[in-house]
């Protein structure tokens, strides 16, 4: 199997970086390759908890300027009410992070990419890179249409 890790722009939602790896690898192990050193804000799901404490992120010269906004695990929010401040903060983080999920939805639903076709990550990565480039064109076109309306 194969996993795709994607970094997107937080305003438009276009893909800025994509990293591929085996499916049995943890999400946080590919985070250093995914996030450039000049990034100021990092949003991620619960699989990236503790990313800011890892050694490879603390050695950057921009590390003190970077803020990590990682969603909590679902079990932490289980007993809280809907009006709770922590739940509202998590909702805001998720609303920014959903731009990545839109990329995955576009690749899977519009471009019908559900299974890896080739043997090896490199061949599948070339195919997905082409799909992500098309996805960026679609996303930017939608963004321009929203601006013009």
Residue map of PLM features:
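Intrinsically disordered, low-complexity and often Lys/Arg-enriched segments
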Residues: 145-149
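Short, residue-level hotspots on alpha-helical faces of the histone-fold
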Residues: 102, 106, 131-136
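Helix-centered, glycine/charged polyanion-binding patches within enzymatic domains
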Residues: 40-41, 46-122, 126
């Amino acid at each position: 199997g194969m996993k795709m890790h994607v970094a997107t722009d937080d305003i438009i939602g276009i893909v800025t970086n994509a990293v591929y790896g085996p499916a049995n690898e943890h999400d946080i192990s590919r985070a250093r390759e995914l996030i450039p050193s000049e990034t100021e804000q990092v949003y991620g799901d619960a699989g990236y908890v503790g990313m800011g404490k890892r050694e490879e992120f603390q050695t950057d010269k921009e590390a003190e300027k970077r803020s990590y906004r990682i969603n909590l695990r679902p079990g932490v929010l289980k007993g809280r009410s809907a009006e709770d401040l922590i739940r509202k903060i998590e909702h805001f983080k998720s609303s920014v992070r959903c731009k990545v999920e839109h990329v995955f939805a576009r690749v899977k639903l519009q471009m019908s990419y559900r299974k890896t076709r080739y043997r090896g990550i490199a061949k599948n990565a070339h195919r997905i890179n082409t799909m992500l480039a098309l996805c960026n064109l679609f996303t930017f076109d939608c963004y321009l249409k929203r601006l013009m309306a």
